[in-house]
From Swiss-Prot:
This is Probable tRNA sulfurtransferase. CDD domains: PPase_ThiI, THUMP_ThiI. PANTHER family: TRNA SULFURTRANSFERASE. Catalyzes the ATP-dependent transfer of a sulfur to tRNA to produce 4-thiouridine in position 8 of tRNAs, which functions as a near-UV photosensor. Also catalyzes the transfer of sulfur to the sulfur carrier protein ThiS, forming ThiS-thiocarboxylate. This is a step in the synthesis of thiazole, in the thiamine biosynthesis pathway. The sulfur is donated as persulfide by IscS.
Length: 404
């Protein structure tokens, strides 16, 4: 027998009361986005489950994709069949025969939500267990901690049989907690911050600052590849490329070296906030970790934050670098993040950046700039690209190969 579908069990959605179906429908849409590379797949949801019909597709890559989607508590490959006792008997016998090995223990666990079905749960357990003994007389039943628990569900529309429960990613479906702008540089920390924001249901749009010719096409492709990795957790993500060359040249030419980083990040924050307002976001997300670099001291954060009253979420703020690296490796962004392309945060980095910049000094130096004009030109020049989970050639690897 081949699996018919993957049955998805919802996570925290069970606590959402009147909003439950909104959360479930969002999860369904996210699953459809993530499984877009598999055109034969169909997805439907009810209050208790989401059903991913395989329609002949190999189940293993579908399971691997679904394991990453936020809002999924657990999933099981299942056999779907008509609610017929003879069909159930045959299916149970075939499944257990395929799983059998010497010393294997099992139990039948039946749940009947269709109370019009001819047998109740106790009767089905007895009948189906007896059917297994008919074809496997040496198998042993074990009610506590068996090797195989064969789950049989009798629902209104069909019967379902499964024996494997796979842990999902948990969290909330992406998009159920509003929209935020993720400041993604291309380093290790910001993709991890994006992952953690996605886990709590935030629909992120990625803001990436590009400063050609100082930053290369490889840096841009790297940021887009990182964004594509994040789409595995909840579907398509809008990637917003911001032209930043003019601003960086202005800062380099007119500001003291010690304040280059502070002023650069204040401009980045202003621009991200303007894009957030334009695109109806609620928060800004970044990958700052307290004390990790000069721009991430409390004094620096205060001086940079002063340009906006928008809430700023820093998911990795209390994490050690090693913890962030381990999480980056776990979500498969680390190898991309360490590829050798400079981003706009590093191209004009001073040798000794100010670790305790004064807000008054930052504001005084900014009097040398046409702040509104610079921000407006940057925002008007953004390029928005929708990044999907579809499998594409790795642009960054191709660019690295060309350099070698």
């Amino acid at each position: 027998m081949d699996y018919s579908e993957i049955m998805v069990r919802h996570g925290e959605l069970s606590t959402k009361g009147k909003n439950r179906m909104r959360f479930i429908n969002k999860l369904k849409n996210n699953i459809q986005d993530v499984l877009a590379p598999f055109p034969a797949i169909t997805v439907r949801s009810d209050r208790d489950r989401t059903h991913v019909s395989l329609n002949g597709t190999d189940y293993q890559p579908i399971v691997e994709a679904l394991k990453l989607v936020f809002g999924v508590q657990a999933l099981s490959p299942v056999y779907k069949l008509e609610k017929s006792v003879p069909l159930l008997v045959t299916a149970v016998q075939d499944i257990m025969t395929s799983l059998y090995r010497d010393g294997l223990t099992f139990k039948i666990a039946t749940k009947r939500s269709d109370h019009a079905f001819e047998l109740d749960s106790r009767e089905l357990n007895s009948l189906l267990g007896g059917a297994v003994f008919e074809v496997l007389p040496n198998i042993q039943a074990q009610m506590k901690h068996p090797d195989v628990t064969l789950k049989v569900e009798i629902r209104d529309e069909a019967a379902y049989i499964s024996y494997e429960e796979i842990k999902g990613a948990g969290g909330l479906p992406v998009g159920t907690s509003g929209k935020g702008m993720l400041m993604l540089s291309g380093g290790i920390d910001s993709p991890v911050a994006g992952y953690l924001a996605l886990k709590r249901g935030l629909d992120i749009e990625v803001v990436h600052f590009a400063s050609p010719p100082y930053t290369s096409p490889g840096a841009l492709a790297k940021a887009q590849d990182l964004t594509r990795r994040l789409t595995r957790f909840g579907g398509n993500i809008q990637f917003i490329e911001v032209p930043f060359t003019e601003i960086q040249e202005e800062i380099k030419n007119k500001a003291p070296e010690a304040y280059l980083m502070t002023l650069t990040r204040r401009f980045m924050m202003r621009i991200t906030d303007a894009i957030r307002e334009q695109r109806k976001g609620l928060v800004i997300v970044n990958g700052e970790s307290l004390g990790q670099v000069a721009s991430q001291t409390l004094e620096s954060m205060q001086a940079i934050n002063a340009v906006t009253s928008t809430p700023i979420i820093r998911p990795v703020v209390t994490m050690d670098k090693l913890e962030i690296i381990e999480m980056a490796q776990a979500i498969d962004t680390f190898d991309i993040s360490i590829q050798p392309f400079e981003d706009c945060c590093t191209i004009f980095a001073p040798d000794r950046p100010k670790t305790n910049p004064k807000l008054g000094n930052a504001e005084k130096y900014e009097e040398r700039f046409d702040i509104d004009g610079l921000v407006q030109r940057a925002v008007s020049g953004i390029i928005v690209t929708e990044i999907t989970p579809e499998i594409v050639n790795d642009e960054v690897e191709n660019l690295i190969d060309a350099l070698l």
